[in-house]
């Protein structure tokens, strides 16, 4: 089975699980979020082993804050589920929009010393995909119009989160944060873009912009 097929199938399974848990909300969604945060913290501590206590403590914050943000978004009001799906759409479309153009059209390296496979073309592909799909969801659901602007901006934040995790792995001398997810590596590899998008969306929600 090709790597792309494995990546696609495992990605679809993860998306289905996330959507089912998000739809259920309550304890079901909280359990999934807690499991993901635990895996993220475990992988973080493995990556930063020997870097000092500050990095270990930062991992706890890194895993906890986006988990709380996702729970806040989902349970805060009647629009929580729709807003949570917007978070997923922006994050996933950024990832896919960056992956496909980056693989097929990418020529200019975005950050060659950190992540040699990431390209400028992939960056813009992710921004465009998030802007279009995230914007379409806003118009379809009637969420706050500010999210039309936030979608491409948060796409940049998602890719910055990806680059930050890539920098950590390069410093630690490892390729993937874990081996839990076939074709994707570990939880951090899959959720590094979700972290900033969840946090920024929670802030926007608290500011009444969603």
Briefly describe each language-model feature range.
Residues 202-210:
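Juxtamembrane boundary at the C-terminal end of a transmembrane helix
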Residues 197-198:
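C-terminal-most transmembrane helix of multi-pass membrane proteins
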Residues 100, 167-170:
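Pseudouridine synthase
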Residues 171-194:
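Interfacial loop-to-transmembrane junctions
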Residues 1-156:
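Membrane-embedded alpha-helical bundles of polytopic integral membrane proteins
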């Amino acid at each position: 089975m090709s790597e792309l097929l494995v990546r696609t199938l495992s990605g679809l399974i993860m998306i289905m699980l996330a959507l089912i848990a998000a739809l259920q909300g309550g304890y079901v969604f909280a359990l999934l979020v807690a499991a993901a945060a635990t895996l993220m913290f475990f992988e973080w501590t493995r990556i930063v082993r020997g870097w000092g206590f500050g990095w270990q403590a930062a991992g706890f914050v890194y895993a906890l804050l986006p988990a709380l943000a996702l729970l806040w978004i989902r349970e805060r009001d009647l629009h929580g589920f729709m807003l949570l799906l917007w978070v997923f759409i922006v994050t996933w479309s950024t990832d896919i929009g960056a992956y496909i153009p980056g693989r097929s059209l990418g020529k200019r390296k975005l950050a060659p010393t950190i992540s040699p496979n990431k390209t400028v073309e992939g960056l813009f592909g992710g921004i465009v995909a998030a802007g279009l799909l995230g914007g379409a969801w806003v118009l379809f659901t009637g969420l706050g119009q500010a999210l039309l602007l936030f979608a491409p901006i948060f796409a940049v934040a998602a890719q910055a989160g990806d680059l930050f995790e890539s920098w950590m792995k390069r410093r630690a001398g490892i390729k993937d944060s874990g081996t839990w997810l076939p074709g994707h590596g570990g939880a951090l590899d899959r959720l590094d873009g979700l972290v900033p998008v969840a946090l920024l969306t929670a802030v926007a929600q608290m500011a009444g912009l969603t």
